[in-house]
From Swiss-Prot:
InterPro entries: Aldolase_TIM, His_biosynth, HisA_bact_arch, Isoase_HisA-like, Isoase_HisA-like_bact, Rhodanese-like_dom, RibuloseP-bd_barrel. Belongs to the HisA/HisF family. It comes from the Bacteria. The keyword Cytoplasm applies. It is an enzyme of class 5 (isomerase). It catalyses: 1-(5-phospho-beta-D-ribosyl)-5-[(5-phospho-beta-D-ribosylamino)methylideneamino]imidazole-4-carboxamide = 5-[(5-phospho-1-deoxy-D-ribulos-1-ylimino)methylamino]-1-(5-phospho-beta-D-ribosyl)imidazole-4-carboxamide. This is 1-(5-phosphoribosyl)-5-[(5-phosphoribosylamino)methylideneamino] imidazole-4-carboxamide isomerase. NCBIfam families: 1-(5-phosphoribosyl)-5-[(5-phosphoribosylamino)methylideneamino]imidazole-4-carboxamide isomerase (TIGR00007). CDD domains: HisA.
């Protein structure tokens, strides 16, 4: 189980949105690279980065900030937001990115995701952002009629490294993860699922370590870490203890 600290980029700064609203952005750090290094120093093993401007624009909009992050941390980084073509994917992986997250393109062009998995095995994740059980696209600005599980099942057997599942209705408001829908998705597919949206406290960390959540690869935490609601040392100690039990 992995706890992924999140860096969301808007205008080259590290921000958090409330309910996916770009007009409700709180700046937490003007130096994303320094934030990435701080997360590494705290003991985190991975980093989750989202180019928010890119998600809306349909192309990379915070490339300089992402490259600075990649230079600042030795941790593997996964990036989503505005990655829509095989050339985009190849360009980022060649710069040292470990994993790309494909969201809107997974809805618009699922065959591209399948081709990307074939061409870049182990390096492609799918981001499914949901509102009211339906998939949202274009930086959460546009709703679709596609169901979450319906979309996820399109990629069974394709080699998708993980599905990052975000409940938009809980993102950035510290309401707790929607465990019901998250675990339903994890049970419905064989692809590892990463929970996102609403992680609020150590209780959520403990919840993701329960036996019925073992199909999850982990969870993403943003605002709860920035606001000090989750102590990194305590959270990582819980995860370490859980891993020790599994290998005992």
């Amino acid at each position: 189980m992995i706890l992924f600290p999140a860096i969301d980029l808007k205008g080259g700064q590290c921000v958090r949105l409330k309910l996916g609203d770009m007009q409700q952005a709180t700046v937490y750090n003007t130096d994303p690279a320094a934030q990435a290094k701080s997360f590494e120093d705290q003991g985190f093993e991975w980093l989750h980065v989202v180019d928010l401007d890119g998600a809306f624009a349909g192309h990379s909009a915070n490339g300089d900030a992402v490259e600075a992050i990649l230079k600042a941390t030795k941790n593997p980084v996964q990036l989503g937001g505005g990655i829509r073509t095989l050339d985009h994917i190849e360009a980022w992986l060649s710069r040292g990115l470990r994993r790309v997250i494909l969201g809107t393109v997974a809805v618009r062009n699922p065959d591209l995701v399948i081709e990307a998995c074939r061409k870049f095995p182990g390096h492609v994740a799918v981001g499914i952002d949901a509102k009211g059980g339906k998939v949202a696209v274009e930086g959460w600005a546009e709703a679709s009629e596609l169901g979450v599980i319906e979309l996820a099942r399109k990629f069974e057997g394709a080699g998708v490294a993980a599905i990052i599942y975000t409940d938009i209705d809980r993102d950035g408001i510290l309401a707790g993860i929607n465990w019901t829908s998250t675990l339903e998705l994890a049970e419905a597919v064989s692809i590892p699922v990463i929970a996102s949206g609403g992680l609020a406290s150590l209780d959520d960390v403990r919840r993701m370590l329960e036996p019925d959540a073992q199909k999850l690869e982990g969870a993403i935490s943003g605002r709860a870490l920035y606001d000090g609601r989750i102590d990194p040392a305590e959270a990582l100690a819980l995860i370490k203890a859980s891993r020790a039990k599994e290998t005992a």
